[in-house]
C-alpha cells in the first residue's frame, strides 16, 4: 500500500515539474531597409507569451548573421526604468536585464521595440539578421540551433565531449558543435565569448576527419592533412591539420591565432599553457531526434540596399530610350542628380519618352528621404546622326561621265547604286560616275559611330545625243551659204566657233 501511494506521489510530482517548465513563445516582426548613417529599430513589433510566467531575468539580442565588428552597434533607446542594457562588441550581442528583480514580458516587449541598429560606415552593405532569445546561447536562424561556449581551462576533448552530451538547453540535447557552414563559423567561433573544442576527430582513421557528435555523427568533412580536401565544408587555419604529436581532435583557434573562428588539430589534452591550451568547449543544441519544438527565439531582418545591376542605353538621334536597374531589396528610385532632390520615377525600368542629348541619371533603393546613401549612375547616350547634302548635278550627255558632289556633317559618306544596297560603290564626298547611257539615280548615306543618316537620292539626267545627218551643200563661188543644223531647241557649237542654230560660211570645206 505504501508503495502504491509513493508511486502515485512520484507521478504527481513529475507532472507538476513539467507544467512549471513551459517555455515562453517569442515572435518578432520586421523586414526593413536601412538608410546609411541612421538608426533603425530592429523590429516593427514584438510579441512574448508565456502560459505560466509574467517575466524573466534577461533577454538577449544578437546580430547573428552579417555582423561587422567595429561598425555595427545595437542600442537601447528611450526610458526603461526596470531594464538595463549591456553591449558586447565581440559577440555582437545586447543583453537586456533587470535593474532589480525580473522585468515583465510587457516591459521587455517595449524595450526590444526600442532597440535600434546603427552602422558607422559611409557605405555599408549586406544583410543583418537579429536573433532575440531568452537564453544566453547564441541562436542561428539558418540552422535553428543554439551555440554556447563553456569556459573550462585545460579540459580534455574527451571530457568536453561527455560534458556537452550531458548538457540540455530548454529540453534540447547538447553535443560538441559540428560546424558545417560559414554562418556557423561566425556564430560559434568568431562571435563566441571564447574558443574551444568542437566535435571533429580523425582518431578512428588518421587523416579521415569526421564529425563524431550530434546529427552529423559519422559525416566525413576532411580527407588528408595540410594539403587535403573537404567533401563538404571545413574551416582549418593555415597549415592545419598538421598532426603534430597525435593531434586527433578539432579545436577552434584562440583569438589572435590565424583567421578568427578557424580550426586547428590538438591532442586530447592540448598544450599545458598558451594559445594551444584548451580554454573550454562549444556546445550545440538542436537537430537531435526527440528534441522539443521551441519558440524561445525569434528573428528580424534589416537589409542595406545595394544596386546589383544597371543597364545604360544608347540610341541614334532624339527619341525614346529605356534604362534598367535592379537591387537586392527595395524599390528603385531614379534621380537627375547624384545627391539630393526627389525621385522622378520609381521602378526597375525607366523610359524617357523623348531625349535629345546624352543625360546621366542616378539610382538607389533606399527609402525616399534617405540622403546619405550612394547612388549609381545610369547613362542614356544620344549619339548624333549625320546630316548630309549634295549639289544637284547638271544633265550629262549620253555615254559620258560626270562628277557628283555631296557632304556630311559627321562620319564617312558612302555611295550606293540602290536605296537598299548594303555594299557601297564608293566612299567619299566626290564621286565620278562611269559613262552613262541612261538617266541614273545614286544614293548617299553617312555613318558616324554606328549611327547612319537617312539615304538621299541623287538623280543624274542623261541627254541622248542629237541625231545629226551628214549633208553636202553646193553654192556659187564668191557667195555665201547658210548651213542648217536641222535640230531645234538645243545648244550649238559649230566648228567655226558659231553657237547659233544655223551657221553662214563663204568658202568650201567640211563643217560640223
Predicted regions and their residues:
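Short beta-strand/loop motifs in extracellular/secreted proteins, especially
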Residues: 52-59, 70-72, 196, 207, ...
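Extracellular, disulfide-bonded carbohydrate-recognition/adhesion ectodomains
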Residues: 120-305
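Generic recognition of long tandem-repeat/solenoid scaffolds
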Residues: 91-102, 146-149, 250-252, 323, ...
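Bacterial Sec-dependent N-terminal signal peptides
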Residues: 1-22, 370, 383, 463
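Acidic Ser/Thr/Pro-rich low-complexity disordered segments
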Residues: 69-78, 215-220, 338-342, 419-426
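Extracellular glycosylation-rich, acidic/polar low-complexity regions of adhesion-
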Residues: 20-142, 255, 263-265, 285-307
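Structured loops at beta-to-helix junctions and adjacent beta-edge loops in soluble globular domains
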Residues: 64, 99, 135, 200-203, ...
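Proline- and Ser/Thr-rich low-complexity, intrinsically disordered segments
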Residues: 301-512
Amino acid at each position: 500500500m505504501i508503495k502504491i501511494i509513493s508511486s502515485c506521489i512520484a507521478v504527481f510530482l513529475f507532472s507538476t515539474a513539467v507544467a512549471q517548465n513551459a517555455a515562453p513563445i517569442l515572435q518578432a516582426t520586421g523586414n526593413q531597409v536601412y538608410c546609411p548613417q541612421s538608426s533603425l529599430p530592429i523590429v516593427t513589433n514584438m510579441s512574448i507569451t508565456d502560459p505560466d510566467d509574467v517575466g524573466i531575468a534577461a533577454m538577449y539580442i544578437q546580430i547573428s548573421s552579417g555582423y561587422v565588428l567595429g561598425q555595427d552597434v545595437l542600442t537601447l533607446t528611450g526610458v526603461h526604468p526596470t531594464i538595463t542594457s549591456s553591449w558586447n562588441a565581440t559577440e555582437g550581442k545586447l543583453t537586456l536585464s533587470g535593474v532589480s528583480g525580473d522585468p515583465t514580458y510587457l516591459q521587455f516587449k517595449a524595450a526590444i521595440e526600442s532597440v535600434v541598429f546603427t552602422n558607422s560606415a559611409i557605405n555599408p552593405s549586406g544583410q543583418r539578421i537579429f536573433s532575440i532569445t531568452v537564453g544566453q546561447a547564441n541562436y542561428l536562424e539558418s540552422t535553428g540551433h543554439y551555440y554556447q561556449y563553456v569556459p573550462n581551462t585545460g579540459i580534455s576533448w574527451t571530457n568536453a565531449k561527455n560534458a556537452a552530451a550531458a548538457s540540455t538547453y530548454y529540453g534540447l540535447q547538447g553535443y560538441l558543435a559540428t560546424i558545417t557552414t560559414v554562418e556557423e563559423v561566425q556564430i560559434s567561433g568568431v562571435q563566441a565569448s571564447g574558443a574551444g573544442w568542437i566535435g571533429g576527430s580523425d582518431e578512428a582513421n588518421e587523416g579521415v576527419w569526421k564529425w563524431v557528435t550530434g546529427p552529423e555523427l559519422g559525416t566525413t568533412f576532411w580527407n588528408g592533412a595540410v594539403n587535403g580536401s573537404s567533401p563538404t565544408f571545413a574551416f582549418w587555419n593555415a597549415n592545419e591539420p598538421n598532426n603534430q604529436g597525435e593531434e586527433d581532435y578539432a579545436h577552434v583557434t584562440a583569438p589572435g591565432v590565424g583567421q578568427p573562428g578557424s580550426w586547428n588539430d590538438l591532442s586530447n589534452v592540448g598544450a599545458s599553457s598558451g594559445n594551444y591550451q584548451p580554454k573550454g568547449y562549444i556546445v550545440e543544441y538542436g537537430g537531435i531526434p526527440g528534441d522539443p519544438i521551441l519558440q524561445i527565439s525569434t528573428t528580424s531582418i534589416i537589409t542595406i540596399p545595394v544596386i546589383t545591376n544597371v543597364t545604360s542605353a544608347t540610341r541614334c538621334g532624339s527619341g525614346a530610350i529605356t534604362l534598367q536597374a535592379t537591387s537586392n531589396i527595395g524599390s528603385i528610385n531614379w534621380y537627375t542628380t547624384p545627391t539630393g532632390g526627389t525621385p522622378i520615377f520609381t521602378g526597375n525600368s525607366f523610359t524617357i519618352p523623348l531625349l535629345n542629348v546624352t543625360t546621366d541619371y542616378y539610382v538607389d533603393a533606399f527609402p525616399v528621404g534617405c540622403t546619405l546613401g550612394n547612388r549609381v549612375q545610369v547613362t542614356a547616350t544620344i549619339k548624333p546622326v549625320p546630316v548630309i547634302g549634295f549639289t544637284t548635278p547638271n544633265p550629262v550627255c549620253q555615254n559620258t561621265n560626270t562628277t557628283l558632289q555631296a557632304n556630311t556633317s559627321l562620319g564617312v559618306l558612302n555611295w550606293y547604286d540602290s536605296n537598299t544596297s548594303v555594299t557601297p560603290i564608293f566612299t567619299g564626298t566626290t564621286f565620278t560616275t562611269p559613262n552613262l547611257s541612261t538617266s541614273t539615280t545614286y544614293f548617299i548615306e553617312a555613318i558616324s559611330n554606328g549611327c547612319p543618316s537617312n539615304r538621299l537620292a541623287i538623280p543624274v539626267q542623261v541627254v541622248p545625243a542629237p541625231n545629226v545627218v551628214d549633208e553636202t551643200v553646193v553654192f556659187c563661188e564668191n557667195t555665201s551659204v547658210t548651213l542648217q543644223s536641222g535640230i531645234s531647241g538645243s545648244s550649238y557649237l559649230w566648228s567655226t566657233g558659231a553657237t547659233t542654230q544655223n551657221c553662214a560660211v563663204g568658202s568650201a570645206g567640211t563643217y560640223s
